[in-house]
From Swiss-Prot:
The lineage of its organism: Viruses, Duplodnaviria, Heunggongvirae, Peploviricota, Herviviricetes. In healthy individuals, EBV typically establishes a persistent latent infection in which the virus can be detected in resting, nonproliferating peripheral B-lymphocytes. These latently infected cells express only 2 virally encoded genes, LMP2A and EBNA1. Residues 145-147, 199-211, 263-267, 318, 376-388, 444-449 are extracellular. Residues 1-123, 169-177, 233-241, 289-296, 340-354, 410-422, 471-497 are cytoplasmic. The chain crosses the membrane at residues 124-144, 148-168, 178-198, 212-232, 242-262, 268-288, 297-317, 319-339, 355-375, 389-409, 423-443, 450-470. Keywords: Host cell membrane, Host cytoplasm, Host membrane, Host-virus interaction, Membrane, Modulation of host E3 ubiquitin ligases by virus, Modulation of host ubiquitin pathway by virus, Phosphoprotein, Transmembrane, Transmembrane helix, Ubl conjugation. It comes from the Viruses. Coiled coil: none annotated. The modification Phosphotyrosine is found at Y112. This is Latent membrane protein 2. InterPro entries: Herpes_LMP2 (IPR010881). A motif (PPxY motif) lies at residues 97-101.
Length: 497
């Protein structure tokens, strides 16, 4: 019987599952080797030595080789719901999940990772090209009535946007995305370019031109609606219900802006409509890049800026019920975005404080822009050639300050970087102060000029506070620099073991 218990030399390791009789084959490897023993038959260890030398199995073997006592809730692969693996039916594995710890390829990150979808087919080219064809046909029909420069400008704009639409479509297909913000932006810009062509080519005298442009605008409007619906459906699992409501409200704002642009024939209101539409598009792209948290707060700030632009149109222009309704929609959208973002942010108090400071700076800058526009509009007819250049220079400084503020919002709330946003705000405050100081020097409407100077100073202080007083003290204060430069006394090493 002793010969039956001998382990032949050179034999391989036993299988981890053991013998069919129930003997644990892994315990044979704990016997001493034949070369190290004095006899041919090694002495098996007793129960205490066997328990002390026994090593626990690897973590990944425990669920699969266990007896079911410790893992009673573990469900074998054969009894799992087959609907979990419907996406793997055509992978040559008969719809079963891939075996554990044998990834399908080098790019697999999980043992049950579904096979990635192939590259998407690009968006149907006839759907993209159709409105552009109607648009180009309308431009060709206007050759007998419109000027050469108008026809050349409209044709170049149409071809450029058609090329941009093709690039956006190929980008969406290469990135395996159903829709991208670039595609939405291109479609909306195309729609407004068609409306602009309708305005500059005097269509009431040409019924064919009117029909072609109306067909092009209608097709592009339907395309925008379909893309937004597909975008909501594609991200319905990741986006919250409030975010989807925000997208629907954004679409309502776009429609109301179109109505406002059609009804208002004032150049001032047209320019303000273009500014507010640009801010809304930037807010929409920023919101798409980060549906929750910082991106949503930045979108709320840009939407608030668009609402202030429309409010400026109410102050400088005529009262319009459509614009008032749009302001209510934008204000509701701002509240929804702030509530949806702060509910998911752990540092909601800090973010709300920074949002409040940014909103306060936005109000100050908007008031400075309105005051500058009032100064320029009041003194435009009575200005001489020597006074026109300083006024235009100050107004350009205020416009650059507004652009810097938008860059600050996009930098901080889009990327989360808290350094460059306050720096841009400080620069905008300095430019506003320079504009107010120049207007105050030439004694042009002293009260408004003093307010512009004060608003610029307050914006600079807000940017300085957002940058951080402690950070500025650390970078500029001599005492703080001295403290940081001092070497700490070395602590003796004590071995207390």
């Amino acid at each position: 019987m002793g010969s039956l218990e001998m382990v032949p030399m050179g034999a391989g390791p036993p299988s981890p599952g053991g013998d069919p009789d129930g003997d644990d084959g892994g315990n044979n490897s704990q016997y001493p080797s034949a070369s190290g023993s004095s006899g041919n038959t090694p002495t098996p260890p007793n129960d205490e030595e066997r328990e002390s030398n026994e090593e626990p199995p690897p973590p990944y073997e425990d669920p699969y080789w266990g007896n079911g006592d410790r893992h009673s809730d573990y469900q074998p692969l054969g009894t799992q719901d087959q609907s979990l693996y419907l996406g793997l039916q055509h992978d040559g594995n008969d719809g079963l999940p891939p075996p554990p710890y044998s990834p399908r390829d080098d790019s697999s990150q999980h043992i049950y990772e579904e096979a990635g979808r192939g590259s998407m087919n690009p968006v149907c080219l006839p759907v993209i090209v159709a409105p552009y064809l109607f648009w180009l046909a309308a431009i060709a029909a206007s050759c007998f009535t419109a000027s050469v420069s108008t026809v050349v400008t409209a044709t170049g704009l149409a071809l450029s946007l058609l090329l941009l639409a093709a690039v956006a479509s190929s980008y969406a297909a290469a990135q395996r995305k159903l829709l991208t913000p670039v595609t939405v932006l291109t479609a909306v810009v195309t729609f407004f370019a068609i409306c602009l062509t309708w305005r500059i080519e005097d269509p009431p005298f040409n019924s064919l031109l009117f029909a072609l442009l109306a067909a092009a605008g209608g097709l592009q409007g339907i395309y925008v609606l379909v893309m937004l619906v597909l975008l909501i459906l594609a991200y319905r699992r990741r986006w919250r219900r409030l975010t989807v409501c925000g997208g629907i409200m954004f679409l309502a704002c776009v429609l109301v802006l179109i109505v406002d642009a059609v009804l208002q024939l004032s150049p001032l209101l047209g320019a303000v409509t273009v500014v507010s539409m640009t801010l809304l598009l930037l807010a929409f792209v920023l919101w798409l890049s980060s549906p929750g948290g910082l991106g949503t707060l930045g979108a709320a700030l840009l939407t608030l800026a668009a609402a202030l632009a429309l409010l400026a149109s109410l102050i400088l222009g005529t009262l319009n019920l459509t614009t008032m309704f749009l302001l209510m929609l934008l204000w509701t959208l701002v509240v929804l975005l702030i509530c949806s973002s702060c509910s998911s942010c752990p540092l909601s108090k800090i973010l709300l404080a920074r949002l409040f400071l940014y909103a306060l700076a936005l109000l100050l800058l908007a008031s400075a822009l309105i005051a500058g526009g009032s100064i320029l509009q009041t003194n435009f007819k009575s200005l001489s050639s020597t006074e026109f250049i300083p006024n235009l220079f100050c107004m350009l400084l205020l416009i650059v300050a507004g652009i810097l503020f938008i860059l600050a919002i996009l930098t901080e709330w889009g990327s989360g970087n808290r350094t460059y946003g306050p720096v841009f705000m400080c620069l905008g405050g300095l430019l506003t102060m320079v504009a107010g100081a120049v207007w105050l020097t030439v004694m042009t409407n002293t009260l408004l000029s003093a307010w512009i100077l004060t608003a610029g100073f307050l914006i600079f202080l807000i940017g300085f506070a957002l940058f951080g007083v402690i950070r500025c003290c650390r970078y500029c204060c001599y005492y703080c620099l001295t403290l940081e430069s001092e070497e700490r006394p070395p602590t003796p090493y004590r071995n207390t073991v």
